[in-house]
Regions:
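Beta-strand-connecting loop/turn residues
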Residues: 52-53, 72, 149
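Broad gene-expression machinery/nucleic-acid interaction feature
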Residues: 28, 42-44, 73, 93, ...
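A generic structural signal for nonpolar/aromatic side chains embedded in well-ordered alpha-helices
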Residues: 23, 67-68, 118
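Charged, gly/pro-rich active-site loop segments
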Residues: 2-11, 83-170
Length: 170
């Protein structure tokens, strides 16, 4: 058996390119770690995706940091779309889950570069303000790198059917 399960409903699986596009577009997701006493610990968090990796920032201490130091395996979920369809008792969803290894960045240069990358994701074109923000908080923050080992995306079967109908009618 491979380390990662294959999706059961293959027709609903998004391509790798579509999954990456969701990661590039979204601004937040849920990071899942192995928490205290073996309980899952899932925390909503902002991020930036770059070159097959996810980057996060954090305070120097806390539940998330303790969990990362204890176990480097993690998953990260982003829900791009979740449109409730009341009469159908379902939602039209599109989501992505990344599995991989998570690390606290120790190298100061890499930490600085990733802090800039994250800052530019949320406030582009304001380098002066970003530099001041980084300088004022750099010693009190961690930068975290999530190396994606497996990425899978899925959408509601209704969205698959709509897409197929459009391509037939095109």
């Amino acid at each position: 058996m491979s380390e990662f399960r294959q999706m059961r409903r293959k027709r609903q699986q998004l391509s790798n390119e579509e999954s990456i596009a969701i990661l590039e577009k979204a601004t937040a997701g849920t990071l899942a770690l192995l928490g205290d006493e073996g309980y899952p610990y899932a925390v909503p968090i902002s991020y930036v995706y770059h070159d097959g990796k996810l980057y996060f920032h954090s305070a120097l201490a806390g539940h998330k940091v303790d969990a990362i130091r204890k176990c480097d395996k993690a998953s990260f979920c982003v829900v791009e779309q979740d449109d409730v369809q009341p009469k159908k008792y379902t939602t039209f969803f599109r989501s992505v889950i990344a599995f991989g290894r998570i690390h606290i960045i120790e190298d100061e240069q890499e930490k600085l570069e990733t802090a800039r990358m994250l800052g530019n994701r949320y406030n582009p074109n304001d380098d002066e303000s970003l530099q001041k923000e980084i300088e004022s908080g750099f010693s009190r923050m961690l930068m975290i790198r999530f190396d994606i080992e497996y990425l899978t995306g899925k959408e509601a079967i209704e969205l698959v059917r709509m897409r197929n109908a459009k391509s037939v009618n095109a």
